[in-house]
């Protein structure tokens, strides 16, 4: 039976099936699955959901994507066998039922009182474009992580994605807040592993002036927020309103999604109206120093591997080795370019109101990571193949 519905004492319940198909000749772990609630045709406002893989309940989450307090998407991760299929059962409920799952991701944004040394949890902040709010947020922006990696997004015109590397898999940012103390470092905590400077860091979207990447300015307003906090995925957003760029006035949202078990970010960029001929760019940082090597397939995939100090304190902290990768689908790629800080592709999406690309990093300190640039660049190509051949999701009505 594809689906069934029931209504008991005012409570509505509906079960819907998904058919998942992996077309690759390899097992896949923690495959992200996201379905629109509207596409499930519940016939009522969904307040909770339960996802079953065979006879086992698996962690999932409902996310309110437009902040109207009504769930819009259901997300979970699932393992898939090579060349295999799975049938997933989803029970939708009109009542709010709290389900406890292991927290495999974490996100936070903290306003700080520098005089009192205190922090307050916040979900969203909007400031005029000419206001310097960078140091008013602990960590300079939203911070989020999976078991593998951590990230933060700078609350300024750079809007750079900055990485946090780990020795061991696990969640650390709730405790370390991106700045581990000496005791935490002695326990094996990770920390900031890259000095991003004026670069795009790990795949941040930038403007392009024909010669180099430029920051997102001037703008009328800038907003950063945490949209989803787990247990399966975290979503952070950066929104600018009134960006004066290449003769246009743009309202743009960059949405970063990180799933459990993943190091890669899904980067969705949205605009209020169709794009014209604006040219943007993204890619990977040309890591400072003389030890950086890069790789490109000249078809939207670019990576770098290098070693440099992550902070200005070169006495307390050692040089860090970092690998970065970004993949842009070919339909958006205009040209492969570079400047002194970055290896890049320019991007155009004429007539579109959104586009998607992907980015990730590794730190050499990872005990579960990559030995050298060759292994990293090899993994990049495997990653691209998986992205270009996603698991098929079919709703069975």
Predicted regions, residues:
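Solvent-exposed beta-strand/loop surfaces of large extracellular or lumenal domains
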Residues: 47-73, 244, 288-305, 326-332
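Acidic (Asp/Glu-rich), glycine- and aromatic
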Residues: 252, 263-297
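Beta-strand-rich recognition/accessory modules
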Residues: 66-80, 324-397
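Short, well-ordered beta-strand segments enriched in hydrophobic/aromatic residues
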Residues: 16-22, 148, 254, 265-273
């Amino acid at each position: 039976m594809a689906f069934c519905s029931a209504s008991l004492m005012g409570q509505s319940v509906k079960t819907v099936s998904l058919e998942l198909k992996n077309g690759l000749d390899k097992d896949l772990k923690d495959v992200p699955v996201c379905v629109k609630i509207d596409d499930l045709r519940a016939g009522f406002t969904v307040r909770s959901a339960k996802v079953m893989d065979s006879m086992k309940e698996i962690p999932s989450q409902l996310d309110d994507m437009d902040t109207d307090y009504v769930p819009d998407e259901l997300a979970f991760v699932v393992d898939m066998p090579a060349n295999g299929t799975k049938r997933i059962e989803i029970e939708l409920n009109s009542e709010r039922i709290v389900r406890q799952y292991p927290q495999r991701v974490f996100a936070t944004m903290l306003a700080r009182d520098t005089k009192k040394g205190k922090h307050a949890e916040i979900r969203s902040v909007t400031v005029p474009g000419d206001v310097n709010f960078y140091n008013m947020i602990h960590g300079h922006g939203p911070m989020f992580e999976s078991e593998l990696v951590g990230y933060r997004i700078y609350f300024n015109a750079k809007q750079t994605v900055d990485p946090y590397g780990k020795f061991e898999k696990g969640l650390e940012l709730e405790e370390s807040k991106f700045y581990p103390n000496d005791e935490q470092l002695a326990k094996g905590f990770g920390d900031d592993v890259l000095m991003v400077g004026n670069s795009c860091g790990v795949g941040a979207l930038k403007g392009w002036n024909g010669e180099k990447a430029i920051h997102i300015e001037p703008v009328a307003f800038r907003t950063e927020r945490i949209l989803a906090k787990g247990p399966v995925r975290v979503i952070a957003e950066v929104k600018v309103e009134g960006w004066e760029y290449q003769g246009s006035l743009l309202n743009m949202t960059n949405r970063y999604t990180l799933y459990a078990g993943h190091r890669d970010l899904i980067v969705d960029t949205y605009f209020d109206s169709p794009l014209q001929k604006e040219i943007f760019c993204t890619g990977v940082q040309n890591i400072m120093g003389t030890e950086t090597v890069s790789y490109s397939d000249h078809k939207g995939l670019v990576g770098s591997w290098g070693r440099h100090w992550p902070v200005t304190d070169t006495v307390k902290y050692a040089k860090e080795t970092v690998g970065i990768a970004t993949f842009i689908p070919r339909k958006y790629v205009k040209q492969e370019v570079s400047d002194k800080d970055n290896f890049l592709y320019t991007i155009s999406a004429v007539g579109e109101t959104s586009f998607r690309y992907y980015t990730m990093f590794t730190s050499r300190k990872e005990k579960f990571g990559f030995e050298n640039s060759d292994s990293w660049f090899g993994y990049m190509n495997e990653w691209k193949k998986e992205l270009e051949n996603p698991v098929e999701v079919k709703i069975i009505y």
